[in-house]
């Protein structure tokens, strides 16, 4: 699989172009949530978006670039949701009682929020669990500097006063990678009860690793 760019090959400089890009991404998302991945082609995306295949290729070179753009858009939406639902409430609690921080509850809330997002967005679930995001895009979204772990890192540095070290960056990368694989394993379980059991074990494991085992 090639590492396709996550931004359009042609930046939309006009409102109409921006609307076309959003129609392409919306159409891809609809198809990803509705039909098997192998049937999601650039031709079907263009048809779903109501544009010509030539118009689609003005902005994206192939379907991998579109998949990556859909994934990045979802990650940004999720970051905003996580900030509102978990990070900001926890920050308010810490201002009142720093000693009351509960790492198990915090990480459980992060994971539960992510699971809820996957359940509500089948297109992102198909991409994330199907490992259809290109390596370069995945690398950027998993980075403690620019990706989702950066949000957790910022919270840990600013609110928990955890030292900023290369070891912390590595631990956040490990948590991100392990969490992704375990969530995929959880969704492979034949029953909802089985899925929930795997997720609960994952919460305990990652909490212990990130907050109990000292950075090396």
Predicted regions span which residues?
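Hydrophobic alpha-helical connector segments
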Residues: 69, 83-119
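Helix-turn-helix
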Residues: 23, 27, 31-65, 69
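N-terminal positioning helix adjacent to the helix-turn-helix/winged-helix DNA-binding module
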Residues: 20-27, 106, 148
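N-terminal intrinsically disordered/low-complexity leader segments
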Residues: 1-19, 214-216
């Amino acid at each position: 699989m090639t590492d396709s760019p996550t931004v359009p090959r042609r930046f939309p400089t006009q409102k109409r172009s921006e609307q076309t890009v959003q129609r392409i991404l919306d159409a891809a998302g609809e198809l990803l949530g509705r039909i098997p991945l192998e049937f999601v082609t650039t031709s079907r995306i263009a048809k779903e978006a109501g544009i010509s295949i030539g118009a689609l290729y003005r902005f994206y070179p192939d379907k991998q670039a579109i998949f990556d753009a859909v994934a990045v858009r979802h990650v940004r939406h999720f970051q905003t949701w996580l900030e509102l639902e978990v990070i900001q409430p926890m920050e308010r609690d810490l201002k009142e009682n720093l000693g009351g921080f509960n790492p198990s509850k915090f990480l459980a809330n992060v994971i539960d929020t992510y699971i809820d997002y996957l359940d509500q967005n089948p297109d992102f679930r198909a991409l994330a669990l199907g490992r259809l995001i290109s390596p370069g895009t995945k690398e950027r979204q998993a980075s403690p500097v620019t990706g989702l772990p950066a949000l957790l890192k910022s919270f840990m540095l600013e609110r928990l006063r955890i030292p900023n070290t290369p070891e912390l960056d590595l631990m956040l990368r490990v948590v991100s990678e392990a969490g992704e694989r375990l969530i995929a394993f959880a969704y492979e379980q034949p029953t909802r009860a089985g899925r929930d059991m795997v997720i609960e074990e994952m919460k305990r494991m990652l909490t212990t690793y990130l907050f109990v085992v000292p950075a090396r």
